[in-house]
Amino acid sequence: EMASCAGLPLVEDRKDPRKTTTYGVGQLILAAAESGVEKIIVGLGGSSTNDGGCGAAAAVGVKFYDRDGKEFVPTGGTTADICKIDLSGKAEILNKVEIVTMCDIDNPMYGPTGASHIFGPQKGADEAMVLELDEGIKNLSRAITEAIGKDISEVPGTGAAGAMGAGMIAFFGSRLQMGIQTVLDTVKFDEMISDADYIITGEGKLDSQSLRGKVVIGIAERAKKQDKNVIAVVGGADDAEIDKAYEMGVTAVFPINRLPQDF
């Protein structure tokens, strides 16, 4: 779980996505691989970072060079300085391990719905910083395309966790899959609800991101196939999102703490 070493709770009131790094995540992945496991599942989400996974990549031997040919470890604030990426030094043991990455959003790397614009503000970025971070990720995308021979910037989920989704594909050869779908498959959810009358689920806030494949909608989509009723108890929700949730298979939404609204 990347949030355990690169998550928002760890920085508290010191949020700055220009400086935070995923280096520790890479160290953990490498340590797990060296322990002899055959499969590693990396959970994305709740990160304080916006470095596109460059820190994690550097921790396993990937090298980044600036325009002067100097090697450095990029952070969110310096991804714009990346000129070249060298994958040849990556730890060979990672090629012997299956790495699966779970994420619950389908955002692209950059742009209006990308990592920086959608998630930057919650990591401490103001409007100007969001634009700076987005340009950095855009440059990283260019460098990745040059390094691996294909453009992955529009692959759903590459914008997850400060574009860590893109880094997992490009630097670790991982595949991305929806976290909620993985969990539901693991617990045999479809069988579990076969004789249920109601399915009660919940989320902190039902918002636009929820509608892009998080827990509530993931469950609703499965339940809809069996004509099951889904009740969502959420911390808060806007009326527009509630209406869309109904369209996507949710039977009823009950916010326990509705935000004040004008009449």
Model-derived regions, located:
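N-terminal loops that bind phosphate or other acidic moieties
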Residues: 1-44, 48-263
